[in-house]
Amino acid sequence: MKSKLLFALLFISQVIGASNGTIKGILQDSATKEPLAFASVSIKGTTQGVNTDLDGFFTLEVPEGKQTLTFTYVGYTSADKAIVVKANETVEITIDLISESVQLEGVVVQATRSKSREATLLIEQQRSVEMKQHIGSQELSRKGVSDVASAVAKTTGVAKQEGSGTIFVRGLGDRYNSTSLNGLPLASNDPEKKNIDLNIFSTDIVEYIAIDKTYFARNYGDFAGGNIDIMSKNHTGAGFVEVGVSTNMNTNAVKQDHFKTLSDRSFFGFSDTKIPGNALKGYNFKNSTQTDTRSPWGAGLNINTGKSFFFGGESALHLFATASFGNNFKQKEGVTRTAQAQNSFTKDLNLNSFEYSTNTTGMLNAKFDINDANSIKYNLLFVNDSKEKNDEYQGYVRDITLDNSDYTFINRQTYRQDQLMVNQLLGNHKLNNQLDLNWGAAFNNISAQTPDRQQYTLNKLKDSDSYQFSINSRSDNNRYYEDLKENEFAANIAADYKFGKNEENLYNGKLTVGYNFRKKDREFKATQFVFQINREYNNNINPNALDQFFNQANFANGYFDIYTFRGGAGTPNALLPQTYDGELSIHAGFVNVEYRLTDKLSGSLGARFETISQDVTWQTQLDANKTNNKFTKNAFLPSLSLKYEVNDNNNLRFALSKTYTLPQFKERARFIYEDVTEIKVGNPDLYASDDYNADLKWEYFPKTDEVISATVFGKYIKNPINEIVSASSSNDITYANTGDYGYAAGLEIEVRKNLFSFDDALTNKITGGLNASFMKTYQKLDNEKVNRENKYLSTSFTHDNASFTGASDLLLNADISYIKEWANDQKLMATLSYAHFSDKLYSLGTEQSGNLVDKAFGFLDFTFKYDFTKNFGMTFNARNLLDPAIERKQENLTQDVLVQSYKLGQNFSLGFKYTF
C-alpha cells in the first residue's frame, strides 16, 4: 500500500513539474539599449514575479501555456507581453521599455535617457553597491542652475568658492579633487589650478553629474575630496529643435552711469591680440589704455536639436547638438587690504571693479548603435570663455604713496580668454551574456591666454588735480602677456565578466579588469613689458587719458623706456619670454570584484597600481638658465565598498580607500606671478601627499523620489600641501608640505521629501530638500619640517595647527518647490533655495600675522518656470536676494582686522524657449 502511494505521489510530482516552463530575458531601454536593473517582471494577475539583475537579466519559471508577463520600471511605460510556453522548455526574449510621455497617438517615439530624472538617479543610488551621488538635468532645471560649478554646489558636502568655479568637496580644495567628462579626464584652463573652471560649462550640455566622494579603482588615484564626472546629453527620441533667448542684469552694474569695459575687445569674447613687433624699439601696442562704456544688460541665445535615424531592425544613429552664447555684466565696490601682525596696513585700498564675461559653447554627440550588443559614440565639445575686468584701486600703498600725495591710484585692466576643445570616442560591446568590453579615448586641447593685461600706478598730489606715475619700481606700470597651451591624451579600456550563476540563473558576481593611460603636456610662457618713466616728464598726468602719455611720439622723445625682465632694446634675447613646460604621464592597471555575498550583503573590492611621472622645466627671472625638476611615484591603491540591505528601503554602506595628491606644474616651477596685492612663486621641493579615506552611510528611501541619509566620513592626509607666506622681505606666497599629517572628519545629512500632494491624477505637490555637512578639519604645522625640506624658502607659522584652507565647518543647502501640472500640458514650477557657508580659512598666517579667514555668508535664490504649452515656456531667476557682504578678516593675536569686503549685487534673468 505504501509503495503504491509513493508511486502515485512521484507520478503526480512529475506531471506537475513537467507542466512548467522557463522564460529568460533582458529588459532594456528602447532607445539606448541600456539594461534596466531591478525592474519588476511578473505574471499578470498574480503575485508571482522576479526583479531583473544589475544587467537587466531575469529568469522566471511559469506554468505551461499562454502567459502574459507585466514589465514595470520607474520612469517608463509599463508593458505586457503574451508568451506561449511549453513544458520543460526555455523561451528567451528581449523587452524594450519606452520612457513615459513618449508614446503619442499610437506611434512609438524614442525617448531621452532616464538618467536626467531625479527619481531614476535615486533608484540607481539605492541599488548600486558603490556609494553614489548625482544631480540630473531635471533637478538643475528645477533649481534654475546655469553652470556646472553652481550645480555641484547644490549637493551635500560641496561648496563653490565665491567669484570662481573652484570646488571644495568635504573641505578639500582644488588640488584634492578631479574632474572628467564622460569618464575621461579634462585639462585645466588656469595655470594655477589642477581642475578646469566648472563655471565655463553650461548646463545645456549636461544630462547628469556624478560626484564620487569615495574612491573606486576605475578612477585615477589623484583624489581625496571627490571626482566630478559630467555626463553629456545624448538624444534618443523624436527629432526636435529648441530655441531659447534670455536677458539678465546685475543690480550693481545697472546702477552705474558709465559701465567701464576695456577698449578694442570683442563683444563676443574672441580676441587675437599678439605681442607687437619691435616691442622694445617703439611703442607699438595695439590696445588703448583707456576704457569704453557699454550698456550693462546681458543676453543669451541657445539652440538645441536632436534626431534619430534607424537602419533595419537593430542599427540606429542618434544625433544631438547644442550651441549657445551668453554674456554677463558685474560690478562691485569694496575694500582690499594687506595687514601686518600689529594691525597696521601695508596696503589699504578702495576697489571699484567692472567685469564683462562671455561664454560660447558648442557640442555634438553622435551615437551609432551597430546592433543590440555594440555601440560607438563620438563627443565633440568646444567652449570659448572670456572675461574682461577693469579694476580701479584708490588708497594707500606702503613705499608707493608719497608724503606729498593724497592717495595712490592703480588701474589694472585684465582680459582673459580660454578655449577648450574636447574630442572623445567611446565604445560599448556585449560580447556574450557574461562578458562586456568598454573603452574610451580622448584628445583634449586647451588654450588659456591673458593678452595685454595693463597696470598703471599713479599718485594724486596734495592740493592739486595733478597725478604722477609711481616710479618706485619699473613693474608699477606694465603690460603683460600670458599664454598657456595644454594637450592631453587619455584612454580607458575595461572588461566586465559576470560569474557565480545562482539557482535563479542570475549572476552574483562581476569581475572588472582594466587599464588607463593619461599623458598631459603643458607649455606656458609669459612676457611682461615694464615702463621706466623719465622723472623730467612725470607730471600733470591724466589717469583717464593715458594714451596722451603712452604713445610713439613720447617714446621717441624719451618720456619713457620699455624693458622686459632680461633688459631693454640693447640686451640680446630680451624678448625671450619666461617659460615653464610640464609633462605628466600615468599608466594604471586595475581590478575590481563585485559580489553578492548573501541576500542582503554585497561587496566591491578593488586594487589599482599606477606609475606616475611629472617633469617640470622652467626658465624665468629667478633661474635665467633652463632648469629641470622631475619626480616619479609608484602607487598601490586598494579600495573596499560594502552594502548591507536592511530591508527594501534601507541600506547601510561602508567604504575604505587609499589615494594620493600631486603638486601641480606651476607650484613646482620657480615662476613669479604678480597681482596687485600679492606675489606668488613656485617651489620645486614639493612632493605628493598620501590620503586615507573612510565612509559609513545609512540611507532610507521612503518612495522612489525620496531619500533620507546620513554619512560619517574621515580622511587622513600624510604630508599635506598648503599655500603659505614665506619668510622674505616681499612676503611672497608659495607652496610647501607644511606638516606630517592632517585630517578631516564630519557628518553629512540629506533629506528629499514630498511634503504635500494635492492631486492623485496630475502632479500638484510641494517638495522639500535639505542637505547639510558638519566638518572638523585639522592639520599640524611644522616650521622645522618646512625649513628642512625646502631649499628656496623658510617660514615661521603663527600657529602650530590650523584647519584646512577652504573648509567650512558647516555647509547647508535647503530648497522648497511647488510643482503643478494641468491636462493641457501647462506646467508650473517655483523653487526657493538657500545656501549657507560658515567661516573658512583662506590662507595660513606667518610671522605672527593671523590667519586669513573668509567669514560666513549665505545666498537666497528664487526660480519660477512656466510652460504655457508643451512647446513654449519661460523661466525667471532671481539670485542673491539677500546680497550679504562678502568679508575676509585677518585674525591677528590682538584683534580681527577686516582686509576685504564687497557686495555682489542681486542678479535677475528672464528667458523664453520654444520647441519645434
Which residues make up each language-model segment?
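Short, acidic, small-residue-rich periplasmic hinge/interaction motif at the N-terminus
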Residues: Q28, T32, S40-K44, T72-Y76, ...
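Periplasmic N-terminal accessory/gating domains of Gram-negative outer-membrane beta-barrel systems
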Residues: S114-K115, A119, I123-F168, G183-A217, ...
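C-terminal beta-signal and adjacent terminal beta-strands/loops
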Residues: H836-S843, K865-F916
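Short, acidic Ser/Thr/Gly-rich low-complexity loop/linker segments typical of extracellular
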Residues: T47-F57
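Outer-membrane beta-barrel signature, preferentially recognizing the C-terminal barrel domain
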Residues: S405-L426, A574-H587, Y660-I717, A727-L755, ...
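Transmembrane beta-barrel wall of Gram-negative outer-membrane proteins
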Residues: K286-E392, M421, P638-L640
